[in-house]
Amino acid sequence: MSEVQSVQWFPGHMAKTRRAIQSSLKLVDLVAELIDARIPVSSRNPVLKSIIGNKPKIVLLNKSDMADPARTAEWVDYFKQHKTVAIPIDCKTGKGLNRLLPEIKNILREQIAAWERKGMVGRPIRIMVVGVPNVGKSSLINRLCKGGNAGKAAVQDK
């Protein structure tokens, strides 16, 4: 037992996902971070902020129907104090998603105006949906695709 193997604290799949996010950031206009409204601290990726840098971001507090409404409101206020828009949503029913596009357009209003000045009126907004496993990324994407099935293959879930 003279050989001791070290335990890698940062698994390969996490490093791969980090690289995929970093390389795809230049292709998107905004990052939508999906977190579980019941456990907002533990359902966040602590390195996400350093990965996305200054890219515009919105936080979506999913499963808000199962969370304490008062605590969820406190979290929305917390994010507001940190200059981040947060919306309580429920991907299964669609509750709260009617606020998503108006909020995104507001966050990107200067960028949208710049596109329009360049003649790119109606340019699609490209969004990267990120979050730890089981927060509802696929459910959100499917809901936004009008109930279509985006499938797990379109989502990197690590």
Give residue ranges: language-model regions.
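Conserved short-loop catalytic and cofactor-binding motifs
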Residues: 5, 9, 63, 88
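N-terminal accessory targeting/assembly segments
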Residues: 1-54
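Short catalytic-loop micro-motif centered on adjacent basic/acidic residues
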Residues: 32-35, 87-88, 151-154
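Canonical P-loop GTPase G-domain recognition
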Residues: 58, 64-132, 145, 150
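Conserved lysine of the Walker
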Residues: 137
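A secondary-structure boundary/capping signal
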Residues: 35, 44, 62-63, 131
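Switch I (effector-binding) loop of TRAFAC-class P-loop GTPase G-domains
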Residues: 13-18, 40, 119-122, 146-158
